[in-house]
Amino acid sequence: MSEKSVLEKLQETNRDAEIWWDSSPLVFKNWAKNVVDRAPAEKKEVWKRQLGRLFDPENPGATQFKGVTTNPPLSLAAVKDNPGFWGDYIKNLIRENPGKGVEDVFWMAYKEIVKRGAQLFMPV
């Protein structure tokens, strides 16, 4: 049985094709963990290695993703993926910016989510 994932096999058909992560990079780690946790026992280790080749936050330049997509709904998924952290972050924004309204705080938080996700992909 081949260890290559479907996406690795697809990439072999066209080296110029780009595989993108169509979500916030901030959710990948938990998403991958959930996929592996739900995998059949005999496939867990293979899927873990395949997902590690797809994206490794420790070495993003050497992984399969060539880009990411983001927008407000995808950034909301990042907030929902780590609500404790982002809830505290937003409370702190409100505290540090007492004259700012809801929309201003939203945009400050949104830009931070996008920035942190982009930082994970900087070498790409």
Predicted regions and their residues:
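Flexible loop/turn segments at secondary-structure boundaries
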Residues: 27-30, 76-78
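Short, low-complexity, polar/charged sequence segments that are solvent-exposed and flexible
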Residues: 38-43, 86-89
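A residue-identity detector for tryptophan
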Residues: 20-21, 31, 47, 86, ...
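Intrinsically disordered regions, especially transient/low-confidence alpha-helical propensity segments
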Residues: 17-18, 28, 44, 83, ...
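N-terminal amphipathic alpha-helix/helix-capping segment at the start of soluble metabolic enzymes
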Residues: 1-23, 29-36, 51-58
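Active-site beta->alpha loop and helix N-cap motifs at the rims of alpha/beta catalytic domains
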Residues: 50-54, 62-124
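Amphipathic alpha-helical interaction segments
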Residues: 28-29, 39, 94
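Hydrophobic faces of well-ordered beta-strands that scaffold small-molecule active sites
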Residues: 17-23, 42-46, 66-70
